[in-house]
Design a protein with these regions (language model features):
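PRPP-associated nucleotide enzymes
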Residues: 1-321
């Protein structure tokens, strides 16, 4: 059977307001332009969406991260509904940062599983596929009843640090949940060793680091996590490894959320450099510290979209050659 030939005339890429620069970069890598759409507010504050060209029979990709405020998620849902009602052939929700992902299970009585609720909403709205980057928990893929591609930026971040040629690097997981990610990252850094923090969380905002397993004395530490929220975990870990004789401390994560006063706290912290990606519009943040470096996931997402359209393997993007 001959593969169906996909032309870019059959593809439409839309974006909401959550991260327009990333969406523009993704379209550019595909030699396309974003399809015109109105995504604004009615006078009463409700979300207004209207696609300004036909999507009938087209493969539609909607690029929208779902970070706070909740309007970003609602924009995505309404855009999906709009193109579904306009007879799109397929609708892929491209969600570089998937909000509410930390609420993937009940940790206390009478709590919601918000990640599952959001997955249900996206599916019910009419999405036929989801593409995301470094979900907080890989099992969130199972919350969807449609194909879900969980891309990873670990190779992008790993390449950056590999080219720094740090002497005596040690990759440190700031908590147990980051171990698998740190292990994958360490494989990208020649001669890197590993260490892990075992911590006790006192509350969602307050973290007590209890024990470090591994050797960091005289080494350059790279703290690896999936996202930076308040930064408290990384700052606490950085102070501890320096107390134990580490030379310098770097930190990296896919998603730079930087909640509350985290940027100020991280700027004043002993961390030498913080490397994140543009799944969120970090570069538009006011007073962004010079120590924060932003790498782009646009080529990664664009290549995944191309492979999906050409019916090629997406997982091969992350396989060792």
């Amino acid at each position: 059977m001959v593969k169906e030939i996909i032309t870019m005339d059959e593809v439409k890429i839309f974006t909401g307001n959550s991260n327009v620069p990333l969406a523009e970069s993704i379209a550019s890598y595909l030699n396309m332009k974003l399809s015109p759409a109105i995504v604004s507010r009615f006078p009463d504050g409700e979300i207004q969406v209207r696609c300004l060209e036909s999507v009938r029979g087209k493969d539609v990709f909607i690029i929208q991260s779902t970070q706070t405020p909740a309007e970003n998620l609602l924009e995505l849902l309404i855009m999906i509904d709009a193109v579904r009602r306009a007879s799109a052939r397929s609708i892929s929700a491209v969600i570089p940062f998937f909000g509410y992902a930390r609420q993937d299970r009940k940790t206390k009585s009478r709590e919601p599983i918000s990640a599952k609720l959001v997955a249900n909403l996206i599916t019910t709205a009419g999405a036929t596929r989801v593409i995301s980057v470094d979900l907080h928990a890989a099992q969130i893929q199972g919350f969807f009843d449609i194909p879900t591609d969980n891309l990873t930026a670990v190779l992008i971040l790993g390449k950056y640090f590999r080219e720094k040629n740090l002497e005596n690097p040690v990759v440190v997981a700031p908590d147990v949940g980051a171990v698998q990610r740190a292990t994958t990252f360490a494989q990208e850094i020649p001669h890197a060793t590993q260490a892990i923090f075992v911590k006790k969380r006192l509350s969602p905002e307050e973290v007590e680091t209890s024990r470090l397993i591994g050797e960091v004395e005289g080494k350059n530490v790279i703290l690896v996590d999936d996202a930076i929220h308040t930064g408290n975990t990384l700052i606490s870990a950085a102070k501890e490894v320096l107390r134990r004789g580490a030379k310098e401390v770097y930190a990296t994560a896919t998603h730079g959320i930087f909640a509350q006063d985290s940027l100020k706290n991280l700027e004043e912290s002993p961390i030498k450099e913080i490397v994140v990606t543009d799944t969120l519009p970090v570069l538009s943040r006011p007073n962004l510290p010079e120590k924060v470096k932003v790498l782009s996931v646009a080529p990664l997402i664009a290549e995944a979209i191309r492979r999906i359209l050409m019916h090629e393997s997406v997982s091969e993007l992350f396989e060792k050659k």
